[in-house]
Swiss-Prot record:
Source organism superkingdom: Bacteria
NCBIfam families cross-referenced by the UniProt entry: dGTP_triPase, PRK01286.1-1, PRK01286.1-3
HAMAP family (alphabetical): dGTPase_type2 (MF_01212)
Keywords (A to Z) from UniProt: Hydrolase
The name this protein goes by in its record: Deoxyguanosinetriphosphate triphosphohydrolase-like protein
Family: Belongs to the dGTPase family. Type 2 subfamily.
Amino acid sequence: MTIDRNALGFGVGERAIFAADPWNSRGRLYPEGGSLTRSDFQRDRDRIVHTTAFRRLKHKTQVFIGPDSDHYRTRLTHTIEVAQIARALARAFRIDEDLAEGVALVHDFGHTPFGHTGEDALHELLEPYGGFDHNAQSLRIVTKLERRYAEFDGLNLTWETLEGLVKHNGPLMNADGEGTRGPVPLPITEYCQMQDLDIASHASLEAQAAAVADDIAYNTHDIDDGLRSGYLTFDMLEDVPFLAGLMRDVRDRYPNLEADRFTHEIMRRQITRMVEDVIAVAQERLARIRPMSADDIRQAGETVITFSEGMAETDRQIKKLLFSKIYRHPDIMRIRAGAAQIVTDLFKAYMADPTLMRSDYWVEHTAGLETPAKARHVGDFLAGMTDTYAVRVHRQLFDHTPDLR
């Protein structure tokens, strides 16, 4: 595929006709007056950045739990990298950069301590009460659990930002009302009774940009961290033809490059090639669909900003490599088992005696609740923990805490 550079925005020219319009938003659940200095989507982004949930991302890990180095990525550094790629894509298509950035910044709010390990453990514990889904938890955080404003709980974000948060990976329901990826999580269906997020349609282009940016950042930077940790080697990367080609390109241009610089040159090329692939695909689909509004994107029946078939296959190959060499490595599996034990122990302890949680949280949120509601609030409390806080509290409550090093 080729890219029409003349059609790209890069901050120049008018907003695309299919961009989300910050001056004509579908509004907020609780009506507010506008700002003289910022658009609605700018205000959303700023509210997201100033939350407790955003600050906590600094101490939540993705893959390398309790690493010995300060250079491994956390949820916060990953989120910033996703936002940068999402904003670059939005600029290329002349769509709203602030909305794309806002969705990218908020997309990981609902993640538990200890990455997907913590989420899997918490989902199993909460399964009798509806389960746990980090995307739905993100919605709970920004619509209920963040308590900063005098007139409402949550952040009172615009419809477009909430839609992007919930649907950035695609529609949640099909035309028959069935979940596209299993049952729609309860927090999402409950919220949609107050403000319909149209979960059977696709999301805006801005949200789609955030979603593919997440994939690009996730794979690229897990390779980087894997090489730093020693779980990956350059020889292992040769198993993926796309990565092998990037390494040949770097070696041909810089024959004697030291390892750290060599790694960086591979990573920057990987991001560039993936972004270029996404842009080429989106240009072709936009030319075919000819959308005249943001709603035309939502009703297009397909994802517009996505990988080509070839790059999607590369994405699968990279994920397979990461799973076999990193995520399923015996050292990582041992640490994951310990992390899951910490989450399980804390959940059971709080369910047996909720007063073990912070007293103000217990009095305000959990006292007197029946078991299903109590379990949901215990889940909220646990999901909001950072890795370090969960380990510290476990040490206070139990005689033995798993070693996560």
